[in-house]
Structures are given as C-alpha cells and as structure tokens.
Curated annotation (Swiss-Prot):
This is ABC-type transporter braE. One of its GO terms (cellular component) is membrane. Keywords: ATP-binding, Glycoprotein, Membrane, Nucleotide-binding, Repeat, Transmembrane, Transmembrane helix, Transport. The lineage of its organism: Eukaryota, Fungi, Dikarya, Ascomycota, Pezizomycotina. GO terms for molecular function: ABC-type transporter activity; ATP binding; ATP hydrolysis activity. It is found in: Membrane. It is a multi-pass membrane protein. Residues 594-823, 1224-1477 form the ABC transporter domain. ABC-type transporter; part of the gene cluster that mediates the biosynthesis of the brasilane terpene glycosides brasilane D and E.
Length: 1481
C-alpha cells in the first residue's frame, strides 16, 4: 500500500469514494491510480507512435529554436522527476502494490513519449500539438486531485518526499502546458496563400473559440462580405480532399459494394472521424459526475448538522470542475464534428461535379447533380452530425441503467421496457422513411429542375403565351412535393413522439413500479439518472430518422456516381492525344483527319440513329454534311466527339491538337462577358482574338452594345439575338487552338448577308480556317454553300450515307445533292469572293472598342438590415399561416412549458410528504397526478408538432412559393438579362428548402425552449430566492451575448446562402455545356473553378457552424456560473434538499435550453432571411404590369389583326436597370434608380401599318431589331414614354392591354422552343393548357407530319424526351402547338375548324433549323391554317419571303425599306435586292 494513514479504510478498493478517511470527501488512492494515472498514460503511449509516424513524413515548417529548446528542457526535467518517483516507490519501504508501480512506470514512459512528440509537433505542425495539449490538460486536472489526496494521506517522511516530488512534477506539467500552448504563427514558413488563424490555434484556443474574436468584432461593427471572412483551412479545401476521395470511390465502384460511398468517406476521413471520440468520452464522464454530485450534495443538505467548510468548498470546486469540463469537452467535440461534416461536403460535392463532367450527353435529367449537390448533401450533413451520438448514447444509456439499478433495484427495468417499446416503434416507422424521403427528394428535383428551365427560357415562355399553364404545372409540382414532404415529416414526427416518451413517461412509470420510500436524495438522484438515460435516448431516437435520411441520400448519390459515364470510343493516332508536343507528322499527313469504319451510333442500344457509316474526312478540308430533318446530322457531330452512348465500328481521329473546336446547334453560353465566353480557359492572344471577332463580324455588334465585348450577356445569352449567340459560339470555336472543328448548323440564326460574309471570312478560300489548314466538319441546312466544300456527305432519314464525295461528282450522280438544285458559283462571282476574302485576310475589318468595364459594386455590403435583421419577414411568415394558427401555436407552447416543468416541483412536494410522520396523501395520489402532468406535456408537444410541421408548413409553403412564382412569371424581361440564373434558382431551391425545413423546426424549438426555459429558471430559483436576484444580470448578459452573436450569425447565414448561387450557376452551366467543355478540353479548368467556388461557399457556412459552437460554449459557461452560485448558496444557507435537488436536476438540461433558445432563435432569424430574400426578389423584380394596363379584351380579340406603329421607339435600357447582385437579401436591395440620359434605342421611330390578314416578313442582319419588334408587339419590350401610345392593335392601344391576356390572344412561335420536363407526355407538351382532346392533338401532329414519330414513341400519352427530337422536329412540334391553339380558338368562338375571322400570328425564325423541303411544308401549313390571320414573320430564308405580301427590311433598329418582295428584287439599288443577290438567288 502506497500510503499507510488510511490503512484500515477502503483506500485500496475501486471506491470510488473513500470511507473513514480524509473526511469521507475524496476518491480512493487505487481509483485515482487506475483512472487518473494508469489509463490516460496507457492511451497516450499507444497513440503517440502513430502521431509521430504521421509527423515524420511532413516537411519542417516551423523554426523557433529557443521555444523548442525551452519545451525540451521542461520535458526532460519532468521525465527526471517521474523517474525519481519510480525509484522511490521501488526502493523505499512504501509497501507499494503492483498497480502503484505500473502506474508510475507508465507515467515515466508517457513523459519520454512526450519528448519525441513535442519535438516533431513543434517543427512539423503550424499549430500547437492538440494531442499533447489535451493529454497535459486532462492529466493536469487528475494530478491536482491526486496531489490533494497525497498531501492529505502523507504521514511519514518517505510519503512526504514522494508527494513533494509529485507536486514538483505537477509544476513542471503546468510549465509544459503553458509552453505548448504558445502559438507559432510568426515562425511558420507559409506558402503564398492566405491562411486562417484557426490553422495556428491550439486546443485551448479552439476549445474556447477565441480564434473567432476578430470575426465577431468585424461582424458587430460592419456589414460583412466574403472578403472579410477568414480563408478556408487548407485541410478543408476541395482540392486537398478530392484526390484521396476519388481513389477510394473508384476502388469502391470496382468492387461494387452496396455501401461503397460510405466506405470511401470513412477511408478518406478516418482521422477526422476519430478526433471527436476522446472529447465525447470526456463529455460522457463529466455528464455522469452530475448525478453523483447531486446525490452527495442533497445527502449532505438533508442531514441535520451544517456542512463543514472544507466539504462546502469541495462541493463548490467540484461544481466548477464538472461544469467547466462539460463546457470545454462539448465545444471540442462539436468543433471536430463540424469540421468532419464540411470535409464530407467538400468530398461529395466535388465527386458529384466530377461525375457530372463524365456523364453521358444523353442523360435525361441534367439538373440531378444540382439537387444532389444542394438538398441531398444538406440532409447528409444534418444526419451525419450525430454519428458519434449513436455509440455515445448507447454508453450513456447503459451506464445510467446500471446506476439506476444500484439505486432502485429491479425497478430500473421499467424505463428499459419503455425504451424497448419506443425503439421498436421507431424501427417500424423507419422502414417507410427511405422510400418516403426518396419520393420527396424526387419531387424537389422535379420542381427545381423545371423552375431552373423556366428561368432560363422565360423570354420564349412569354412569347409562346405559356406562362399560365407552366405556372400551373410548377405549382402542381410544388403541391406534390409538399405532400410527399408531409408524408415524410409525419413519419419524422411520429419518431419524435417515440423519442420524447422515455423523457416524459419513464419517470412516472419507474416511480410507480418502485413503490418504495423515496426521500429527496433518492427521488432526485433517480430523476437525474432517468434524465441521463432518457435524454440520450431522446436524441438517439430523434436522430435515427435523420441518419436514415442521410443514408438514403448517400444511396442516391452513390447511384448517381455509379451510373454509366461517357465512354470515349474514338481512337486517337499518336500525337493527337497522348503526346501533343511531339506529333508523328508523317503518320498524321498520310491519314485522313477523321475516319469512321462500319460505324453505327445511337442514343439507345436497341435503336441506332446512324447506321453503317464508312466516312473519311480529308485533312485540311471543309466537309459539309447535309440531309433532311431527323437524318442524324447532329448525331454525327456527337459521334465524332465520342458522345454517343452506344456505338459500333471504329472512329479514328488524327489531329495535332488534343482538343476539338465544337459549335453546338443550340449555343452554349455562360453568364459572363462576350470576351470571357470567346476566350474561355484559353490564354488571351490579342491578335487571334481580333482575327476571330473580325471573322464572325462581331465588331459591328460591339459598337451597339453598351460595354462592347465586355457586355454581360446574362444566363443563356439572353441579352443577345439568336444570330449573335451563334456568332459568339463560332468565335469561341475559332479562338481555340485546334486543327479539327465540328460545327452544327451555325448559320441557323443569321441573315443572308451576315451568313455570306461570315462564311467567306471563316470558311472561304482565304478564310481563317483555310489559312490555318484546319479540318472542318460543317452540318447545315444552308445548302447554298455546298459548292465551296472540299467534301460533301449526304445523310438520309434512316441514318445512312446516301452519297459522299466532291460537289461536282455528286451533282453528276443525279441523286440527293443534285435534287437540291444548288449550282456552283460562276467564275466571276468566285473571283469576286476570292478578292473579298483576300482583302479581309490582309486587313481585318475590326475596331475593338476598349471600354472600361462597369464596376458593379458589392451590393448589400452597406445594407444595415443585414446587421439588425428584417422584422417585416415575421409579418410575411405569419400572414402566410393565416390568423388562427399563430394563436394555436403560442397556446400549445405555453401549455407544454407548464406541463414540462411543474412535475419537477410536484416531486418536491411528493418527497417532502413521503418522509413526513403523517403523510397528507397516498403514494398513488402523487404518482397519478405526476403521470397525468407528463401525459399532458406529451399531448401538447404532439399538438405543437402537428401544427408546425404539417399544417403551417403546407399552408405557408404553398403561399410563399405561389407569391415567388408569381413574381418570377410577371418579372420584366430586363430582370432576366441582368440577373444570374443561379441566383434566382437558389431562391427556389435553397431558400424554399430553408422555409420548408429549417424555419418550422427553428420556430418549434424556439417556442418549445423559451417556455420550457422560463419554467426551468423558476424551478432553479426555487432552491434559493437569492439566486433569482442574479437573474436580471444573467439575462442581461445573455441578451448582450445574443446581440453580439446574432449580428455576425445573421450575416454569415446570408453569406452562406449567397455564396452558393455561383456554385449552382456553375453546376447548371456545366450540365448544359458538358459536350462543348469536353470537346474544348476545358474539363480540368472547369473542375478547378468548381473547387474554387465550392471553397468560397464553404467559408461562410463553416464559420457559421463554428460561431454556433462558440455560443454553445459561452452558454455552457453561463450554466457553470449558475451551478457554482447554486452550490455556494446551498451549502452556505442550508437550502431545502428537495428544492436544491430539483434545481440541480433542472440545471442538467438548463444549459441545453439556454443554448437552444439563442441557437434556434438565430436559426429562426437566419431562416427568415430566406423570406427576406423572397421579399427582396419581389421588390427587385417589379412586375412588368404597369398602371393603366386595365383592358382585358374579349375572347375573339383581335378580330381583324390590324397593327399600327406610329413613330414608336423602344429601349431595353429605358426600363429600370435591376442589377440584382448575389446579395439578394433585403428590402434595401440595391438597384440603380437613375435613368440613363441617352438610352440606346433598340427600335427607332418605327412607322408601319399592317393591314388585317396581311402576311409581313421582317428581315435584316442579325442584331438589327427584328426580334425586338416581335418583343414590342408582345409587350416584352416597352416603348419609351414619349411613344407609349403609338402602338395599336385593332384600334386598341397596346399600352392599355393586360400583358398576360395579350400573349394568350396573340399566337407566337419563338426561335428557341420551350418544352415541359422530360417525362411529360406528348399531349401535355402539345397542349399545356389541357383544353384539347386526343383527336385534336393527333390531327395537328398529322398536319405537321409528326404523328408517325409520336406513334412510334408510344403515342400521345407516352413520356416525351426532348433529346429524342431533332432541332427541326422541335420546330415542327412548336408549329403544331400554334396550330392547335388556332383550332381550339376557332372552335371556342364557334367559327368551325377551317379558320377564324382574324387573329395575329408572330413567327421568330421558326424554320431556321429545317431543310428546304420541311420549310416549304411548314409554310404550307401556315398558309392553310392561318390564311385569315395577320402573320408577322422574322426570317432569314429569302426564298420563303417571296411568298409574303410585304417585306420589311430593318437595320440598327430602324425600318430602312418595305414593299412587295418581288418588286424590290427587280428594282435596282434596293436593300432587299442586295440581300437577295448575296443570298445566291
């Protein structure tokens, strides 16, 4: 035995309390040796080699030799003292036991390990050693307790000597702790990147979150922007994590494991997953000290004699230690856990994006990755937050059950039975949660996908008059989504009820079963054990559904990641791909640039689109591919790019460069400047840039654009005309350093003059591509350029090659090419074109306008409402609920607060009556009322949950979405040209997700915790009225903390939401343009951009999580202060043991309630930020409807179709410029309210009278104002105020007509066709308004020659996939939609199916992507179906214009000529005549 003073006591037992010695207020020596010395030292010794091995591989980045020398000196001294203790134990007559010697030896070994660990950690790590500091901190507390024991137990000289050396070692450990805590920031050899102060923070700085102080001060005093935030810790960076994660996920994919994604995460993040465990164990230990402390204190207070001073100070010291350790261990646990979550987010988001770049081009849902990256990852993070609670709660339940058994005997089985029933109930309902969540996520995915499509195509939707049916479709998806979500939330609510049963019903059931004398000590100790059992069970049962949801979302992501990716089947000859620096020139020169042998390609394995192709494309040639619509021209382009999912035969590519220039039929443009879109990720070359701008004739357009080539083109290039989009896409293709270019119908939106000039400058004999000796594959409907081709390929409708060869040979074959009637240009014409080409080659005709780009301020930075919040958001949310629901919610919260807290007071009366000589009431009386109170608490909680999670959520969700969608639909076109698509998409995804999920949860928890907290404060004060005196000061401090915290928290939450918008936009852009990105070889750069955007979005989100943990820590410190005050008052004033027990038991959860009130109030405030953003959206996107638009014409309007424009002018700039920035947050959303002094006019002084039934064609070069004229007639573009009433239709001022009604009455077909989401039926797409019969739809499809196609796909009710339709078929489908509208209108007006008295048809390049035969068929349909309509058609096909009554030629927004097209062609010097001749007619 080490000490002999207490030889006759239980000092050599495990105790843990010593009896008969040291005032019975100490641990036994054996317990201290085992738990305070031996166990920590053994753990440290086992873990140290692993840490040292990890550090040895890292580079040396810290100097500071003096600090390192000081550390080593102290450690050597400490090791010497430990050695001295071991010698004393073994040499002197202590009578030491084996555990004493082992404990001392392990302490010495641990000291030696500390020397090596400190040396390497000092040099290799930028932060103080977390592992060593944690060991020093906790063992220091243990050593202080042991030192006290040793001094009290020492009675002989050897014992005193041993204790003195132990105390000296303790002093050395304190010195070492202080030295090891020193930050090494000024000695770290950083790289060039900025670093966060977190990266140099030690465990103490991390534990109290002092590294966040600067952020809090900044957030309190100013409005934060992204630039004000700390840089992201490099260990959380996407590039740092993704490389390791991709290796593990690829390995899991090869093995085909069902939980491969979870395995990959575990292998990648195993160290971050382990780090929370020690802190969690420390927290569990400190939790279980609370009931022991309550038992000891109430036992002392129930005795008649006063509490001795030293024991009273011991109780106070114990309360300080217990609650301080709880605060620090909890903060460290959640710190490491939050870091883990954001590492998981980085891994998953990067993997999803990478898979998006590898996905097949034919994948139907391009928005799937966006939903997975946003909604699914958020739910995974929410569920994974509690992963360590799973095993931690099991330990807590087991320990509390064992302690309860020691106190109450077999009665401990009662709560276990309750727990088993609840676990069974939760397990039963969890079986349905996976499918329920998948249905809900699928509903969100459908709605967000459609909304994103609507945002990107709003102009065409408005032109088509489809705003109302599409709004109804989106709202139906929203209702379906909320219904699916309600089913899931109902399951969650049911599981939550089961989770609260142990907390509320276990105590009355347990006490009822015990039926023994229960004094205050037993009653409140038992209650504390039950609380320790039921609280983790409640957490466990509540979090199990969230964990199940996280697993389901991981399954969805794994399915996506394991989906079949693109398989590039092409064969690249040496030099073209593998070694671009050293091409095999001889081999390349002898082989064709592209060769297809026995090639068959298809989008589905059972149906090939292209069949039996044998094609060779000569090097340096211009190969033109022609054929009727749906012959496979676009599919051939995809086949050459390796993008067809199913292929047979071989495709061989032999080029010098690894990248391929590609122009898609639908131009892919990102939201940025024209220059950025042209250059992409290529290095800037001014000469090359000027060359391609001149070749595509964009210089002329730059002169009319407000910022020239730095003009922002908006999402999908919405600010550009169709021809401008095509030419920007062509310029990007030409700018790329490539010798193989594949172009799909790049002339579809160009007028004849521009088309001819672009062709000569780019493809002509001395054009850009000829000079570069590039190989060009050009698929086109513009057959007049075929004579210029080196090689021609003609495809048939069955996907085979009809003929191929030179133009002359094919004309002589008397086959398809001959049937087109195209003639080779005359010698004089060819010479003229050559001279033109030569001139342009010598002197590029371009004058690049170097204008300084407009500085767009970081909007919102000076928005003071970001500091104080938006109180109006509460009103909006309450209004969305209705009148009675808020009252019902408040009432249910009040009832729950009472019924939750009063049972604790009831136990005080029960315990007092139980020990009374003459009890006032029986056991059953108290037990029954106690049970009724708890059942009432349960019922009020259920009521509150149903109100908020089901009723309120559904009602407000529908209402707020309807308001936001209405704002979106009625927003002016200018709004969509100045606002990034990702920002608006974020409103309908992230913000509505907040309103659906976080907002109801935050509101419920605030109501729940406020009323419970008020009751708990009253219960705590019941032990001593003096404690209540401190409440004003405590609550004042809480108010200051909340105010201080909330300013920063609210801003970080808003920044979190805002920083995700660019990430979402980038995901959408990548999904839409992946074929182009892969062809250009830009995928790696695009992934780097995604990593940057992801890291940027992580910064506010991660810091928000950290400051929430700071708040937890501060409030736990407040609880510690209350505990110390309560203990001090109890032992000094001899408080009632029952009320003291009730106060201490309540205090066990009071900290959580305090934290919860502030945390969830902040969550409520920041979640209401979503509503503020919707309010700001409503304000910024002011409705396009203006005062005075009060005329709703009758159904038959316009009966005649007469249009009069009387000197009208219009400007896009004249509308209020709404520069909606990424900070779409508050009512003070910045917008530029100043009108430009001289707005650029899109239309100038137009004078035009279109007679009823007249057929008018509009032509002119691209950007001349043709589409703007269509927009003017549909009120997408408003006249300037001076000419507001200068447009009339059938004698009705256009300015007075309701816009929605106007677009429904006028039938219009846009250039870009709008379809419902994939999976919608052909019938729904043809008739979104659902007013026709199947027979009507079939008749229309037969009229436009699409019925056979639809029938082959399964008929009208079959699901439709837009990618299965060629561009020409899409335009035919759109024409069919217009024909159906005309027929339904005629029938509703009683005019029969053959025609109507009048109407207006507007056509915007409806035949730009079809061949001549199809175009003639379309014009015949228009002539027959709309013979009595007034037709205004924008067209570049001049031969079709000849059939119109009149042609209007436009230039720079003005009408420069009008007249009969045939007469204008004959007259010399006319503009139309020039266009006619240029067009090769």
């Amino acid at each position: 035995m080490l000490f002999s003073a207490c030889a006759d006591t239980n000092d050599q037992s495990l105790g843990p309390n010593v009896l008969g010695c040291r005032g019975d207020f100490d641990f036994t020596v054996k317990f201290e040796q085992l738990c305070f010395s031996l166990t920590p030292a053994a753990i440290f010794i086992l873990a140290s080699p692993w840490r040292v091995a990890h550090l040895v591989r890292k580079p040396t980045i810290v100097g500071a030799p003096l600090l390192r020398l000081a550390k080593l000196g102290v450690l050597v001294s400490y090791a010497s003292l430990e050695l001295s203790q071991l010698i004393l134990i073994t040499v002197l007559p202590f009578g030491a036991s084996g555990i004493d010697i082992i404990s001392s030896a392990l302490r010495l070994a641990a000291a030696l390990c500390m020397v090596g660990l400190s040396y390497f950690d000092h040099s290799k790590s930028p932060r103080p050693s977390i592992f060593l500091s944690a060991y020093l901190f906790f063992t220091l507390l243990f050593d202080i307790a042991q030192a006290r024991t040793y001094w009290l137990a020492s009675s002989t000289r050897p014992e005193i000597a041993f204790t003195a050396i132990f105390t000296a070692a303790l002093a050395m450990k304190i010195a070492m702790l202080l030295l090891e805590a020193q930050r090494k920031t000024k000695w770290v050899a950083w790289d060039s990147k900025d670093h966060s102060p977190e990266e140099t923070s030690g465990i103490y700085t991390l534990g109290v979150f002092s590294w966040l102080n600067k952020l809090f001060f900044d957030g309190y005093h100013k409005t934060l922007g992204i630039r004000d935030l700390y840089p992201l810790d490099q260990n959380l960076a996407a590039t740092h994590l993704s490389e390791r994660f991709s290796r593990h996920i690829n390995e899991a994919k090869r093995k085909g494991h069902e939980i491969g994604l979870m395995e990959a995460l575990a292998k990648t993040l195993y160290v971050p997953m382990i780090l929370p465990i020690p802190a969690k164990l420390a927290a569990i230990g400190s939790f279980f000290c609370q009931p022991l402390f309550i038992s000891s204190l109430t036992s002392r207070l129930s005795q008649s004699e006063p509490v001795p001073a030293n024991i009273g100070y011991g109780f106070i010291g114990a309360s300080i230690c217990i609650y301080s350790v709880i605060a620090i261990s909890q903060s460290l646990y959640w710190y490491f856990q939050q870091r883990l979550l954001y590492m998981m987010r980085a891994c998953l988001a990067t993997a999803i994006y990478t898979k998006t770049t590898e996905a097949r081009a034919a994948d139907e849902d391009e928005n799937a990755s966006l939903t997975l990256m946003s909604i699914d990852i958020e739910r995974i993070m929410k569920g994974s937050l509690y992963m360590h609670e799973l095993w931690g709660n099991v330990i807590e339940v087991a320990l509390s059950a064992w302690l309860l058994y020691n106190l109450l005997g077999v009665a401990f089985i009662a709560p276990i039975v309750v727990v088993c029933i609840c676990v069974g109930g939760v397990s039963f309902f969890m079986r349905f949660m996976g499918d329920s969540q998948r249905n809900w996520m699928a509903g969100i995915q459908k709605r967000v996908g459609l909304t994103s499509s609507v945002i990107g195509n709003m102009k065409n939707i408005k032109i088509s008059g489809l705003t109302s049916p599409i709004s109804r479709f989106v709202e139906k998806l929203r209702v379906d989504e909320l219904q699916a979500g309600s089913n899931f939330r109902l399951l969650m609510l049911t599981c939550s009820v089961f989770a609260y049963i142990p907390l509320l019903l276990s105590p009355p059931i347990t006490f009822g079963v015990a039926r023994r004398s229960l004094d205050a000590t037993k009653l409140f100790t038992s209650l504390s054990y039950l609380l320790l059992m039921s609280t983790p069970l409640q957490n466990l049962l509540e979090t199990l559904p969230q964990m199940a949801a996280a697993v389901a979302c991981l399954g969805r992501i794994q399915k996506f990641l394991q989906g079949e990716g693109r398989d590039d089947y092409r064969i690249f000859l040496a030099g073209s791909r593998r070694d671009p620096e050293k091409p095999s020139l001889d081999q390349l020169d002898k082989s064709p640039a592209v060769a297809i042998k026995d090639g068959s390609f298809g989008w589905k394995p059972d149906k090939m689109v292209l069949n039996n192709l044998d094609v060779e494309i000569p090097r340096g040639s211009l190969t033109i591919v022609v054929g009727p619509i749906a012959s496979g021209k676009s599919s051939l382009c995809k086949a050459l790019l390796g993008e067809m999912p199913h292929s047979q035969g071989t495709v061989t590519i032999a080029t010098k460069f690894s990248c391929v220039g590609y122009c898609d039929q639908t131009p892919f443009l990102s939201n940025g400047s024209i220059r950025d879109n042209i250059i992409g990720y290529s290095p800037f070359d001014a000469q090359r840039y000027a060359e391609v701008v001149d070749g595509t004739m964009l210089g002329i357009d730059f002169e009319t654009l407000p910022e020239a080539d730095r003009t922002n083109i908006g999402s999908n290039g919405i600010t550009l005309s169709g021809g401008q989009k095509q030419r920007v896409s062509l310029a990007r293709c030409l700018y790329l350093q490539s010798d193989l270019l594949i172009m799909d119908d790049v002339f579809s939106g160009l007028d004849a003059d521009t088309e001819d000039q672009v062709f000569q400058r780019v493809f002509g004999a001395n054009g850009i591509l000829k000079r570069r000796q590039a190989t060009v594959v050009l698929c086109t409907h513009s057959v007049r350029h075929i004579p210029s081709a080196t090689h021609v390929i003609a495809l048939s409708t069955d996907g085979t090659v009809v003929e191929q060869g030179t133009f002359g040979d094919l004309v002589a074959n008397q086959s398809y090419i001959h049937s087109l009637g195209v003639k080779a240009p005359s010698t004089s014409q060819a010479d003229s074109e050559k001279i033109e080409s030569d001139d342009s080659a010598i002197e590029p005709q371009i004058n690049l306008i170097e204008r300084a780009p407009t500085e767009t301020p970081e909007v919102g930075v000076n928005d003071k409402s970001r500091l104080s919040g938006d109180s109006a958001a509460y009103i909006v949310y309450m209004k969305s609920m209705g009148t009675m629901l808020p009252i019902a919610i408040f009432t249910s919260g009040l009832l729950y607060g009472f019924f939750y807290n009063f049972p604790t007071i009831w136990l005080t009366y029960w315990s007092a009556d139980a020990v009374a000589t003459n009890p006032s009431h029986s056991f059953g009386y108290y037990a029954a009322i106690y049970a009724v109170l708890e059942v009432c608490a349960m019922l009020s909680l259920i009521w509150l949950g149903v109100l908020l999670y089901i009723t309120v959520l559904t009602r407000s969700g529908v209402s707020l979405h309807h308001a936001a969608l209405r704002t979106l639909i009625h927003a002016p076109l200018r709004f969509f040209t100045t606002t990034d698509q990702g920002i608006i998409t974020n409103l309908f995804s992230q913000d509505l997700s907040l309103i659906d999920n976080e907002l109801p949860s935050a509101l419920l928890n605030v109501i729940y915790m406020v009323f419970v907290g008020i009751g708990q404060a009253a219960v705590i004060a019941s032990s001593s009225p003096y404690l209540a005196i401190s409440y004003p000061f405590l609550f004042g401090m809480l108010y200051v903390v909340q105010k201080f915290y909330l300013r920063t928290s609210r801003q970080l939450r808003l920044l979190d939401l805002e920083a995700k918008s660019p990430l979402y936009t980038h995901f959408l852009d990548t999904s839409k343009g992946i074929v182009t990105l892969r062809a250009f070889g830009f995928v790696s750069e695009d992934r780097a951009k995604n990593a940057f955007l992801l890291d940027t979005s992580q910064r506010p989100a991660y810091l928000l999580a950290m400051i929430q943990q700071w708040l937890h820590f501060v409030l736990n410190v407040v609880v510690a202060i209350i505990a110390v005050m309560l203990t001090s008052l109890a032992v000094r004033l001899r408080s009632n043991s029952g009320f003291t027990g009730a106060s201490l038991v309540t205090l066990m959860s009071f900290g959580e309630m305090l934290s919860g009130v502030v945390i969830y109030y902040t969550a409520l405030e920041t979640s209401l930020g979503a509503i503020s953003r919707l309010k700001a959206f409503d304000k910024a996107a002011k409705t396009e409807t203006k005062d005075g638009e009060d005329i709703v014409p009758p159904e038959e309007w316009p009966p005649r179709g007469e249009i009069i424009l009387n000197n009208v002018s219009a400007s896009y700039e004249y509308e209020l410029p709404l520069f909606l920035s990424i900070r779409l947050t508050t009512n003070e959303l910045s917008s530029n309210d100043t009108q430009p002094e001289t707005p650029t006019l899109a239309l100038k002084n137009l004078r035009l009278r279109i007679r009823p039934g007249e057929k008018i064609a509009i032509c002119g070069r691209t950007g001349s104002g043709k589409s703007s004229l269509i927009s003017l007639l549909l009120k997408l573009l408003d006249p300037i105020d001076e000419t507001l009433d200068c447009v009339n239709i059938d004698n009705t001022p256009l300015s007075r007509i309701d816009r929605v009604t106007l677009r429904q009455r006028i039938i219009a077909i846009p250039q870009d066709i709008v379809f419902l989401p994939d999976g919608s039926t052909f019938q729904e797409n043809l008739d979104p308004s659902n007013v026709s019969t199947a027979a009507d739809a079939q008749a229309v499809l037969e009229a436009v020659d699409l019925w056979d196609f639809v029938r082959d796909k399964g008929g009208l009710e079959a699901g439709m996939t837009v990618s299965n339709l060629s561009q020409g078929q899409r335009q035919l489908f759109s024409l069919g939609r217009a024909v159906l509208r005309r027929r339904i209108r005629a029938r509703s007006l009683g005019l029969g199916g053959g025609g109507s008295e009048g109407g207006i048809l507007l056509l915007d390049e409806v035949s730009s992507s079809v061949d001549r035969e199809t175009e003639k068929a379309m014009q015949e349909v228009i002539r027959v179906e709309f013979r009595e309509y007034t037709v205004v058609a924008v067209s570049h096909r001049l031969d079709i214009i000849m059939d119109y009554d009149r042609v209007v030629v436009m230039e720079k927004g003005e009408i420069v000529e009008e007249g009969n097209p045939a007469r204008l062609v004959e007259e010399p010097g006319t503009r139309f005549g020039e266009l006619w001749s240029v067009g090769g007619n």
